[in-house]
């Protein structure tokens, strides 16, 4: 890792897949007494910078004379802490202030976020991590933004937990911090030099050719600008007992469903799906049926029937954390980008008919089968392809019809800031860039049967149609905390 001013930064193969945007998260703490929170967070951030120098850097993209790009990095000095931590005091209670700003995304950004998701001048230095502590009379809204060029959502969750531990140390608690600097160096070394050695003659349709970071960032900014007026982020919950019941029923049905089509399974290779697979299948099925309402009706006009029978394929894109899937594995506290995108295709006709349980079985198994195929060899092949493709490739929203990001195992709710602030009670990603973007939010450890939390980005019309879907209405409930 670069440790001196204005040094070149060599992106890892996975870094190259992401544009110059920010992963942004809001953590809400409802508190009786907010005095001293700003001081605690400032001291915690100062300690975090000493512990994890990687987080206290800025990145700058340069366009060279030969039209190639280069990236440089330099540290933010302790005297410039305000570039990493912004403190803003608000007169109104937390939820009231959010509700009043919720109809204007630019206003929400200006008041509550440390940096914009998309309004970035990529030629200017941009911090790896920047935090804004919004101090309200009844709590703190901690807004965290991390630069996706070098850091993914899992890395952000690790950084938030490290910040929380640093705040606890400032309060005298005994906390063991990970060896963050060594882990960042080791993770980059693996991704740059040790892992990209698997050579296969194939392309990866999950990504698109990309001219440069400038054009890529401009395209993303255009999408985000359009979404600000057309896409709404809605929040939902699914009771844990509903998820368990659906998973149990699916696993009971799977062999029967596939044996009816001539598949025979032995005792050791019987198909199975996880709770997350079931939730993804339920989401995919319900949004698809809202988008193509004719799928579940028996009386269909000819053009709708033709569409259903045409063999059209729909895709869901699922980011997959590869830290533990590669060999050798990446360090557990590696904060850099460690996620790749996989596509799960399904014929549109899979979602037709009224036997929705069989649909969830089939779709859930398709998700499980694709995720199980993400081996170390496939990941290494992708890394090699990124480094040797004739043109740069990058993530693009046009590769799938829907995207489901599973944050279930990210430890945001376990970030304990100590006796002064405790753990966050609510978490959200405030950005819905395109319609059909879904987040399965982090799991709560308490209570044990806490509901699953979902965040869905759709147009108002699609949300209305989704609400009319009988299966969705049976299992999913609105979460009204976030406006």
From Swiss-Prot:
Belongs to the fumigaclavine B O-acetyltransferase family. The lineage of its organism: Eukaryota, Fungi, Dikarya, Ascomycota, Pezizomycotina. It is an enzyme of class 2 (transferase). Pfam families: Transferase (PF02458). Keywords: Acyltransferase, Transferase. It comes from the Eukaryota. This is O-acetyltransferase pboB. Its EC number is 2.3.1.-. It comes from Aspergillus ustus. Disruption phenotype: Blocks the production of protubonine B and leads to the accumulation of protubonine C and protubonine D. Pathway: Secondary metabolite biosynthesis. InterPro entries: CAT-like_dom_sf (IPR023213), Sec_Metabolite_Acyltrans (IPR051283). Monomer. GO terms for molecular function: acyltransferase activity. O-acetyltransferase; part of the gene cluster that mediates the biosynthesis of protubonine B, a hydroxylated and diacetylated cyclo-L-Trp-L-Leu derivative. The first step of the protubonine B synthesis is performed by the nonribosomal peptide synthetase pboA that catalyzes the formation of cyclo-L-Trp-L-Leu by condensing L-Leu with L-Trp.
């Amino acid at each position: 890792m670069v440790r001196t001013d204005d040094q070149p930064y060599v992106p890892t193969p996975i870094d190259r897949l992401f544009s110059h945007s920010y992963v942004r998260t809001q953590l809400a703490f409802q508190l009786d007494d907010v005095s001293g929170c700003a001081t605690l967070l400032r001291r915690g951030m100062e300690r975090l910078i000493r512990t994890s120098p990687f987080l206290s850097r800025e990145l700058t993209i340069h366009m060279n004379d030969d039209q190639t790009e280069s990236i440089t990095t330099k540290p933010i000095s302790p005297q410039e802490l305000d570039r990493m931590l912004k403190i803003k005091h608000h007169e109104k209670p937390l939820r009231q202030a959010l509700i009043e700003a919720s109809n204007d995304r630019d206003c929400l950004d200006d008041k509550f976020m440390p940096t914009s998701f998309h309004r970035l001048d990529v030629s200017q230095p941009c911090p790896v991590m920047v935090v804004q502590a919004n101090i309200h009379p009844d709590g703190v809204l901690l807004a965290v933004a991390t630069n996706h060029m070098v850091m993914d959502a899992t890395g952000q969750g690790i950084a938030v937990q490290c910040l929380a531990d640093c705040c606890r140390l400032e309060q005298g608690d005994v906390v063991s911090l990970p060896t963050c600097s060594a882990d960042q160096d080791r993770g980059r070394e693996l991704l740059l030099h040790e892992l990209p050695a698997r050579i296969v003659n194939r392309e990866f349709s999950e990504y698109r050719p990309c001219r440069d970071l400038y054009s890529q960032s401009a395209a993303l900014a255009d999408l985000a600008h359009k979404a600000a007026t057309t896409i709404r982020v809605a929040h939902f919950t699914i009771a844990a007992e509903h998820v368990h019941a659906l998973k149990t029923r699916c696993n009971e049905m799977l062999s029967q469903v596939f044996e009816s089509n001539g598949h025979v399974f032995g005792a050791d290779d019987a198909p199975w799906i996880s709770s997350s697979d079931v939730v993804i299948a339920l989401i995919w099925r319900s949004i698809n049926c809202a988008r193509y309402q004719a799928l579940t009706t028996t009386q269909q006009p000819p053009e709708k029937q033709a569409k259903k029978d045409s063999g059209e394929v729909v895709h869901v894109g699922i980011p997959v954390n590869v830290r533990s899937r590669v060999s050798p594995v990446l360090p557990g506290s590696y904060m850099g980008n460690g996620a790749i995108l996989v596509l799960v295709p399904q014929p549109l006709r899979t979602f037709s008919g009224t036997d929705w349980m069989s649909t969830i079985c089939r779709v859930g198994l398709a998700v499980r089968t694709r995720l199980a195929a993400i081996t170390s060899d496939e990941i290494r092949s992708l890394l090699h392809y990124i480094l040797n493709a004739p043109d740069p490739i990058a993530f693009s929203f046009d590769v799938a019809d829907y995207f489901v990001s599973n944050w279930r195992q990210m430890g945001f709710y376990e970030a304990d800031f100590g006796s002064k602030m405790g753990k966050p009670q609510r978490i959200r990603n405030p950005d819905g860039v395109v319609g059909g973007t879904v987040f399965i939010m982090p799991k709560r450890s308490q209570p044990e049967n806490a509901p699953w939390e979902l965040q869905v980005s759709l147009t108002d019309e699609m949300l209305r149609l989704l609400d009319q879907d009988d299966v969705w209405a049976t299992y999913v409930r609105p979460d009204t905390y976030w406006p």
